Every structure is written in C-alpha cells, then in structure tokens.
Design a protein with these regions (language model features):
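A short, structured active-site edge motif that brings together acidic residues
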Residues: 109-128, 154-160
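Short coil/turn segments at secondary-structure boundaries
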Residues: 48-51, 95, 168-171
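Short helix-terminating capping/connector loops at secondary-structure junctions
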Residues: 29-31, 74-78, 113-115, 146-153
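Non-catalytic pre-domain segments flanking phosphatase-related domains
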Residues: 1-40
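Hydrophobic "anchor" residues
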Residues: 43-44
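Short, acidic loop-to-helix structural element flanking the phosphoryl-transfer center
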Residues: 23, 51-83, 90-111, 128-133
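Conserved Lys-Pro-Asp/Glu-containing loop-to-beta segment of HAD-superfamily phosphomonoesterases
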Residues: 131-170
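Short histidine/acidic/glycine/proline-rich micro-motifs that form metal-
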Residues: 87-93, 122-126, 162-165
C-alpha cells in the first residue's frame, strides 16, 4: 500500500487526503475553477461482496467499469476532482479497516494518475453532509493553492442519497 501519511490531515472531526499537488492539466485560468464533487460509497465505489456495508478493507470495487476513465477525463479537461464522504463509523472501527479501505480506493485513483482531494467527515456535526463544513474546508484548501474563484455553473456534485424511496437518506441532494 502506498504511504499517504504525508498527504493526510487529521482532525478530531474530519480527515483531508490531499493528492492535488498540481492544478488540472489543462487548467489555464486558476480564477475560474470547475469542481467535480463526488460521494464515495454508492457513487464511485460499492462493496464487492454485495453487502450494504463492507466486511473488510478489501470489500470494494468501482461502481462502474469506466469510473477511472471518467475521473481521469474530467481531471485532464481541467476539472478539480473532490470526494466528500461521511464515515461516522471510522473512529469506532477497532482495526481501522474503514480508513485502510478508503486508502486502497484512493491509491487506485492515484495509480490512474488522477489528482484529487478527499474530505472525510468522521462525526455527526457540521462537517457531515448535508451540512457544508466539508465544502467550506474544500474551498479554503483550494484558495490556499491559489484557486480564488469557483465556477458554480460548470461545477457539480454527484451522490446516491437523493431521498428517493430506495435511498437511505437525502443528504447528498441537500449537500448539492
């Protein structure tokens, strides 16, 4: 497993994993940043076991065969890839398999030459979707990198918790 320790910022309420060391390949105007936000579970990945919750750190697969290609194409076209995920069981996991699972997934993105930032809400507070604490952290982090203005018209958020009958919540819809 790749060592991401130098890219991880731990806080009592959140974790930030920053693999966005450079701006998107074709980004010419750092003042007009296009953000592509994604939920993790049920959007980018799912369990390989078919269970609702993962059994271990290896229990995952990409939701669709073309996920890496789509993310890479978005990055190469100048979008900033951001993952926002609620992981309230992270601190309760005795063997930390939840964080290890996330690191496995993010290593797969890194191996595909996709630069991204991942914001993980650990507690049920203002960082947890649908609250906007993770988004605020994201904007502050991007501003520190020199990205000053965000094109909301050319940005989006994609998640699975939309409040439909089959959904467990509507937090992604409200977050978007």
């Amino acid at each position: 497993m790749t060592d991401l320790n130098s890219d991880i910022i731990h806080d009592t309420s959140y974790i930030i994993i920053d693999k966005l060391k450079s701006f998107p390949h074709q980004q010419t105007n750092l003042l007009d940043v296009r953000i592509c936000g994604f939920d993790l579970d049920g959007t980018i990945i799912t369990t390989s076991s078919g269970n609702t919750f993962p059994k271990n750190e290896s229990d995952w697969k990409f939701m669709f065969d073309n996920v890496l290609q789509v993310l890479h194409n978005l990055y190469m076209s100048g979008h900033v890839i951001i993952i926002f995920t609620n992981q309230s069981k992270l601190e309760k996991s005795a063997d930390n398999h939840i964080l290890n699972r996330i690191i496995h997934i993010l290593n797969a993105l890194t191996s595909a030459n996709i630069k991204f930032m991942c914001f993980i809400a650990k507690d049920k507070n203002h960082y947890r979707k649908p609250m906007t604490g993770m988004y605020d952290l994201c904007i502050n982090s991007l501003m520190k990198k020199g990205m000053m203005k965000f094109s909301r018209a050319h940005s989006f958020f994609c998640g699975d918790a939309l409040g439909r009958k089959k959904d467990f919540a509507d937090s992604d819809l409200k977050f978007a």
